[in-house]
């Protein structure tokens, strides 16, 4: 896979200890970036650090649903370096159930992490980007946010809202050298599939014309390009990577 020039850039990747986030982390490091990964699970963060073994990689234990704490963490980071790139990747699927059987607590938890977490991280990081007149933000949404997945109302709704947030923030920052994009991957073989029933996984795969799940490196390459200085004109846009499932 080709590399993009991210030298002298610092990237913050939420949910960076596993799945999409872990693969994006490796891609960014190979492209020369300094990378800070966030996750709520410190053991997974420490394991990621050991696996990669790169001096340009560091971590913070962070709950993206808690604005006060992550804002304080960002302020501490900004004392040492600017955050040039923000990848909002942290997310959960929640249970598989019809809307009328979906618990209020489960609904709120999915929205808190997937939507509010994205809002919180943008709110904390953007002021420093504005001050430096540079930034790249990529929000990891989902094809479910475009098409809606049956029995996944909270997840689909949260990811649809992330697309609206991306378009809004992108327009608000369009007059500055800060670009905001979202990507809408279809299902990939990550731990998030373990939260779903086999029936639901087979249903997801049946809707992908390419007939397979997304490879992690395919997404990380797209995210890396979107995060590079080369990608300077596009903003408030959604980039599809669903194997033909969604064509808009």
PLM region spans:
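Active-site helix of classical SDR
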Residues: 122, 158, 166
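Canonical Rossmann dinucleotide-binding motif of NAD(H)/NADP(H)-dependent dehydrogenases/reductases
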Residues: 4-34
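Short C-terminal tail/terminal secondary-structure segment
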Residues: 2, 93-96, 147, 224, ...
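Residue(s) in the substrate-gating loop at a strand-loop-helix junction
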Residues: 142
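Short, small/polar-rich loop/turn modules that mediate ligand/substrate recognition or access, typified
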Residues: 174, 179, 215, 234-236
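Alpha-helical segment proximal to the catalytic Tyr-Lys
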Residues: 127, 171-175, 232
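Substrate-binding pocket helix/loop in short-chain dehydrogenase/reductase
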Residues: 97-99, 103-108, 193, 204
């Amino acid at each position: 896979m080709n590399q993009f020039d991210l030298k002298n850039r610092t990237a913050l990747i939420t949910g960076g200890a596993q799945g999409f986030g872990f693969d994006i982390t490796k891609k960014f490091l190979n492209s020369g970036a300094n990378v800070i990964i966030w996750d709520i699970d410190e053991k997974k963060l420490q394991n990621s650090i050991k696996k990669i073994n790169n001096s340009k990689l560091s971590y913070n234990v962070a709950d993206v649903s808690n604005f006060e704490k992550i804002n304080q963490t960002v302020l501490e980071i900004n004392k040492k370096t600017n955050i040039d790139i923000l990848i909002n990747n942290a997310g959960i699927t929640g249970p598989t159930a019809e809307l009328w059987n979906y618990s209020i607590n489960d609904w709120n938890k999915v929205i808190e992490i997937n939507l509010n977490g994205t809002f919180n991280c943008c709110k904390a990081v953007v002021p420093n980007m504005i001050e430096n007149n540079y930034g790249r933000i990529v929000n990891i949404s989902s094809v479910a946010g475009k098409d809606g997945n049956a029995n996944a109302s909270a997840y689909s709704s949260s990811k649809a809202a992330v697309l609206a947030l991306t378009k809004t923030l992108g327009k608000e920052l369009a007059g500055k050298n800060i670009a905001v994009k979202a990507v809408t991957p279809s299902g990939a073989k990550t731990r998030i599939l373990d939260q779903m029933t086999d029936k639901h996984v087979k249903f997801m795969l049946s809707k992908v014309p390419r007939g397979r799940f997304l490879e992690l490196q395919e997404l990380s390459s797209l995210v890396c390009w979107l995060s590079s200085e080369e990608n300077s004109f596009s903003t408030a846009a959604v980039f599809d990577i669903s194997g033909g499932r969604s064509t808009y």
